[in-house]
């Protein structure tokens, strides 16, 4: 897998992604502490609002930026958004009002909504070979999982010697380093198929129209709901299950999340070889089915053995299985997007996936949390299992088994 790093351009881009991820992880910890510093017991409401603003920025900004990304130099766009994020990070330590957090978070996440899909659409241009690109996707998944495990630990170590405000400085350094790595390489020039002028509506909706006209991508949307259901259950309710239901320590929350992350990392390591042998469709639909079965099993276990001594081990095993299946269901996404559009359409298509996937999370995050709080964790598990099962079945129906690599070309009346 690491052989793909021999590509000079990709190596720099991967390091830029990795450093920016660590910086983002530090900012996540610091933002929670800043919210508590300003709002005290209402910090949860502040963070919840910040999360909603983040999702709104991702869903609203990504398609707009994606529509114009092919008309802008990609390197300049990536560097500019990195520098904007660095500037916002440097402003956050000076915040003394909650509303200021909301404004800065919107600017920060809008820049991320511009950076991430453009970055993702650039990788297949740098690595046109399918096998190399698959390995790059697995490395990217590993980077995300490693960040989720290491950034909180790094923040904990730093907080023993510095004030949390300095974590924002670390975030800014990460974004600046990312910008320097991007500017140090020449990115492929993507030529537009046509210079014909089109309206704003046509440009901003093109990615979603291509997405919805492509059967494999409609199937991908169903799979995205399945993966969002599983990840929402883990992200939202792990702390409640471990701390409230099991009455275990804060470190056990980290252990449970590490079980999910470890499973995801294991799958990312194995996926390149697996995808050499099996189709994306078979792997991803099977993974979604495993998510549904795993969540269903946890529903039964929670209903019958929630108070048993072995529930903790069952939770760890369940989270590991969900982590494996989650990684298998989301990692090949880039391969589907790559083969579903021309080079000049890829930024807008990646932006469409970015927005639609976060729209799925915008549904499943609050649903998992509300059901867990109001009806109990078994109800939350059951609802997420139903969503995952519907996603797996829907994908199997919508995504043709004889998948043809044809590019969908939407008309103005198609959407």
Report the location of each language-model feature.
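Alpha-helical transmembrane-bundle signature of multi-pass membrane transport and export proteins
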Residues: 1-415
């Amino acid at each position: 897998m690491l052989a793909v790093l021999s590509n000079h351009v990709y190596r720099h881009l991967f390091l830029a992604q990795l450093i920016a991820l660590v910086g983002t992880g530090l900012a996540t910890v610091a933002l929670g502490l800043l919210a508590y510093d300003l709002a005290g017991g209402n910090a949860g409401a502040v963070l919840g609002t910040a999360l909603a603003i983040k999702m709104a920025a991702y869903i609203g900004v990504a398609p707009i930026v994606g529509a114009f990304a092919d008309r802008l130099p990609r390197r300049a766009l990536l560097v500019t958004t990195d520098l904007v994020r660095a500037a916002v990070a440097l402003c956050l330590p000076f915040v003394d009002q909650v509303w200021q957090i909301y404004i800065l978070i919107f600017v920060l996440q809008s820049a991320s909504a511009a950076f991430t899909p453009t970055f993702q659409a650039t990788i297949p241009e740098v690595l046109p070979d399918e096998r190399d690109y698959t390995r790059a996707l697995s490395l990217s998944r590993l980077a995300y999982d490693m960040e989720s495990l290491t950034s909180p630990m790094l923040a904990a170590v730093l907080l023993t010697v510095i004030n949390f405000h300095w974590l924002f400085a670390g975030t800014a350094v990460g974004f600046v380093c990312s910008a320097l790595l991007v500017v140090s390489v020449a990115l492929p020039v993507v030529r537009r198929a046509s210079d014909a002028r089109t309206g704003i509506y046509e440009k901003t909706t093109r990615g979603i129209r291509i997405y919805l006209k492509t059967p494999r991508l409609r199937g991908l949307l169903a799979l995205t709901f399945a993966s969002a259901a599983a990840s929402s259950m883990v992200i939202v309710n792990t702390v409640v299950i471990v701390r409230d239901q099991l009455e275990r320590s804060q470190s056990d929350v980290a252990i449970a999340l590490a079980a999910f992350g470890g499973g995801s990392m294991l799958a990312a390591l194995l996926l390149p070889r697996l995808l050499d042998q099996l189709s994306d469709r078979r792997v991803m639909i099977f993974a979604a089915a495993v998510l549904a079965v795993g969540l269903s099993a946890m529903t039964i276990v929670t209903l019958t053995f929630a108070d048993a001594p072995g529930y903790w081990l069952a939770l760890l095993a369940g989270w590991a299985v969900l982590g494996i299946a989650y990684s298998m269901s989301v990692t090949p996404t880039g391969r589907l997007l790559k083969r579903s559009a021309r080079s000049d359409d890829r930024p807008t298509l990646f932006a469409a996936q970015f927005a639609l996937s976060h729209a799925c999370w915008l549904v499943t995050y609050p649903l998992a949390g509300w059901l867990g709080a109001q009806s109990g964790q078994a109800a939350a598990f059951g609802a997420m299992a139903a969503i995952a099962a519907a996603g797996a079945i829907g994908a199997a129906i919508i995504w043709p088994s004889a998948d043809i690599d044809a590019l969908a070309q939407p008309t103005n009346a198609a959407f």
